[in-house]
């Protein structure tokens, strides 16, 4: 009498197949994770250096990868653009120092000006400078730091959250058409002011001297909304203009308020 065939070879084959599937799945997940955090240099103008933050840096070139722990440093006339795998874009103005951590999704602005464009639905990106951090999952804006004198953050479209890194619960939302101006060692966030989006789009070198942003239509939509409100007299932006290395905000055409006539006592 013949004994039934053993099931051991079949089970062993099935086990091998399962192991191969698991290894392939793990490889795919690791590849996707690397893609999500991969950042490359896509534009270089004049002097731009890249490398580990605490080591000698090399001249950056288009196509180079930016890794966690790296820093990028632009010269007096230098500019650069970085592109993430999810189409997040960061542009750096002259005399700007930025370091990267958390798989490059957290950036620290030590000095200078940077534009950020974070597509809607992208993984959250954070920018730290001084006592302030800015985070968003969908917005286009500009942030500038000048030594210990000031920090400026303005939003062209979308919404960003600004918060203090040394005080829990101290945060506010900055919407499109708003600008936050404060000091690097601030202990309480001021209310944001308004600015003219169209004027910034015309004067900012981080926009004017680069190809159009992917969020261009969203910004134009915000411009149109502003124009309608300004025509109705319900929206009065601050008289700010963008000059210099990227976002040097300066008052222009400043007109003093008319003096009020002294009131006359009529005896009533």
Residue spans for each PLM region:
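C-terminal interaction modules
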Residues: 2-5, 9-14, 19, 28-36, ...
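Short N-terminal segments immediately surrounding and downstream of signal-peptide cleavage
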Residues: 34-51
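Hydrophobic residues on conserved beta-strands that form the core of alpha/beta folds
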Residues: 41, 109, 136-138, 174
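Short, small-residue-rich packing micro-motifs
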Residues: 44, 72-134, 153-162
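N-terminal post-signal-peptidase region of extra-cytosolic proteins
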Residues: 52-69, 73-78, 93-94, 138
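Short, solvent-exposed loop/turn positions at domain surfaces
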Residues: 54, 60, 66-68, 86, ...
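Extended lipid/amphipathic-ligand handling interfaces
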Residues: 97-102, 138-142, 184
């Amino acid at each position: 009498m013949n004994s039934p065939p053993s099931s051991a070879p079949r089970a062993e084959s099935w086990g091998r197949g399962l192991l191969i599937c698991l290894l392939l799945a793990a490889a795919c997940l690791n590849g996707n994770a690397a893609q999500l955090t991969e950042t490359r240099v896509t534009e270089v103008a004049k002097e731009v250096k890249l490398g580990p933050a605490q080591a000698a840096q090399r001249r950056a070139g288009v196509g180079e990868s930016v890794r966690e722990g790296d820093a990028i440093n632009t010269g007096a006339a230098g500019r650069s653009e970085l592109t993430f795998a999810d189409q997040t874009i960061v542009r750096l103005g002259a005399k700007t120092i930025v370091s990267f951590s958390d798989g490059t999704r957290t950036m620290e602005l030590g000095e200078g000006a940077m534009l950020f464009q974070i597509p809607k639905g992208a993984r959250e990106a954070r920018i730290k400078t001084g006592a302030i951090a800015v985070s968003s999952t969908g917005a286009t804006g500009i942030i500038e730091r000048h030594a210990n004198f000031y920090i400026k953050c303005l939003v062209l479209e979308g919404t960003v959250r600004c918060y203090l890194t040394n005080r829990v619960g101290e945060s506010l939302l900055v919407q499109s058409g708003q600008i936050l101006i404060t000091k690097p060692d601030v202990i309480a966030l001021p209310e944001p002011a308004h600015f003219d989006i169209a004027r910034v789009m015309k004067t900012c070198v981080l926009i004017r001297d680069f190809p159009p942003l992917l969020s261009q239509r969203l910004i134009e939509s915000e411009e149109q909304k502003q124009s309608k409100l300004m025509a109705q007299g319900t929206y009065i932006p601050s008289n700010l203009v963008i000059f210099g290395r990227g976002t040097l905000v300066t008052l222009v055409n400043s007109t003093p308020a008319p003096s009020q006539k002294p009131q006359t006592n009529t005896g009533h």
